[in-house]
From Swiss-Prot:
The keyword Membrane applies. PROSITE patterns: AAA (PS00674). Its EC number is 3.4.24.-. This is ATP-dependent zinc metalloprotease FtsH 3. Residues 1-14 are cytoplasmic. It comes from Sphaerobacter thermophilus (strain ATCC 49802 / DSM 20745 / KCCM 41009 / NCIMB 13125 / S 6022). Its cofactor is Zn(2+).
Length: 489
């Protein structure tokens, strides 16, 4: 064994060098954490006084009425104290994306004339532990100093997810805990209201929703027809509209679009008008803009064989014809064989009035419309194509919901089943049989409707092949008046 020579002091020098490297690494990490935390914390204290008011928010009447009390409290908190009334510390705005949650929060601050501190919940959290909690403390400290004030936390589900959830994380939980501490720590004389927004209220931690925290909940839903018309008018105020523009008609065919979608529709229409060199937005621009928002731009350059083009026309004509002939179905408003996105063509349907309740008969008509393209292909060619795959998926999902959610089956009438819950093999087979029976019944209805009005199917197909797109007026000229719709079918 040959011992290795060791220079005097070598091990000490190496130890000191290693210790120095470790100190530098730790120092850099601490500096980086403080720098990042400080940089983002400084942005937390940025404050504004919005000029937005409730008059800038079209629709949402009930939500504005609910929040008017918050405005009164922020304007005159002493009045509430004299009455011994405790205002909610937190207000949760819950609803689908684009329904105006942020706009409404800004309008509350604008109406009250108070400072508005806004952050997205995802901005609180970094990879470093403790940074999120520090930003929460900084945000609430700034709001207390500026009292009366509003703190707005957008997408609070980013940090407010139910603790113990498989997708939760230690830093998110610490940040949530700090938010809870701050909500509990308000002094009675501090007029600070916290407004949070979420699309997923179902996953929020119950501790957020208990009294004294976010104990006032305001649900925002997609706008109804009257609200859509009001939203369109608000966003059309600064845009030149041609005399043929009918915003009420546009509101009728934009069922399911949010306020943000409607704003985007008008902006798209303005861009389309500029693209064609026009000085005004026409109804045609608006119709094309709706199609773009819903399904994307048309694909005119896509090469199709004559048979494929005809098949698409037959398929879309089938949807439109069944929708027109069935009294309880939504009316066809626009049909096109121009491809958009992954779709070969499209049939746009819209009810004469918004619905809140559906009967089994109405759902059955809706199923028949979904299967109208399938039935038309089968009637014309004796076989079907892959173009019906999306329709079949939607029809199957609706039939499943009718049986398992709405109790509209026959052998399982009046019963509901948890979609993710366990059921016996016998019940599972019964559900499958009920769903299959509903789809078969709807397909038979669609096929019978098309066979009884084959001349109208031929007329629609010919018009689509010649014109590519048919609007509501053109459809009415070809198909004639619709059957009278019963009040409840």
């Amino acid at each position: 064994m040959n011992p290795r020579p060791v220079r005097p002091g070598g091990s000490l020098q190496q130890s000191l060098l290693a210790l120095g490297s470790l100190s530098v690494a730790v120092g850099l990490a601490v500096w980086q954490q403080r720098t990042l935390g400080r940089g983002r914390s400084d942005s937390v204290t940025a404050v504004e006084r919005p000029e937005t008011t409730f008059s800038d928010v079209a629709g949402l009447i009930e939500a504005k009425e609910e929040l008017a009390e918050i405005v009164t409290f922020l304007r005159d908190p002493e009045r509430f104290r004299r009455m011994g009334a405790r205002m909610p510390r937190g207000v949760l705005l819950a609803g689908p994306p684009g329904t105006g949650k942020t706009l409404l929060a800004r309008a509350v601050a604008g109406e009250a004339g108070v400072p508005f501190f806004a952050m997205s919940a995802s901005q609180f959290v970094e990879v470093y532990v403790g940074v999120g909690a520090k930003r929460v403390r900084d945000l609430f400290a700034a709001a207390r100093k500026a009292s009366p004030a509003i703190v707005f936390i957008d997408e609070i589900d980013a940090i407010g997810r139910r603790r113990g959830d498989s997708q939760s994380h230690q830093e998110y939980e610490q940040t949530l805990n700090q938010v809870l501490v701050e909500l509990d720590g308000f002094h009675p004389r501090q007029a600070v209201v916290v407004i949070a927004a979420t699309n997923r209220s179902d996953i929020l931690d119950p501790a957020l929703l208990r009294p004294g925290r976010f104990d006032r909940r305001v649900e925002l839903s997609l706008p109804d027809r009257a609200e859509r018309a009001a939203i369109l008018r608000v966003h059309a105020q600064d845009k030149p509209l041609a005399p043929d523009v009918d915003l009420d008609a546009l509101a009728a065919r934009t069922v399911g679009l949010s306020g943000a979608d409607l704003e985007n529709t008008l902006n798209e229409a303005a861009l389309l008008a500029l693209r064609r060199g026009g000085d005004e937005i026409t109804q045609a621009d608006l119709e094309e803009a709706v199609d773009r928002v819903i399904a994307g731009p048309s694909r005119r350059s896509r090469a199709l064989s004559a048979r494929e083009r005809e098949t698409i026309a037959v398929h879309e004509a089938g949807h439109a014809l069944v929708a027109h002939q069935l009294a309880s179905a939504d009316a066809p408003r626009r049909v096109t064989i121009l491809g958009r996105g992954q779709m070969g063509g499209a049939t746009v349907l819209a009810p004469d009035e918004d619905r809140r309740l559906w009967t089994r008969g109405q759902f059955l008509d809706r199923l028949a419309v979904l299967l109208g393209g399938y039935a038309a292909e089968e009637y014309r060619y004796g076989e079907v194509t892959t173009g019906s795959s999306g329709d079949l998926s939607q029809a199957s999902a609706l039939a499943q919901a009718m049986v398992t959610t709405y109790g509209m089956g026959k052998s399982l009438r009046g019963r509901a089943f948890d979609a993710n819950g366990p059921v016996s093999d016998e019940t599972s087979r019964a559900i499958d049989e009920e769903v299959s029976a509903l789809v078969s019944e709807a397909l038979e209805l669609a096929s019978r409707t098309i066979a009884n009005a084959a001349h109208l199917l031929d007329a629609l197909v010919a018009a689509l092949l010649a014109e590519e797109t048919l609007d509501e007026a053109r459809l009415a000229a070809i198909l004639g008046p619709r059957p009278a719709r019963p009040a409840m079918n």
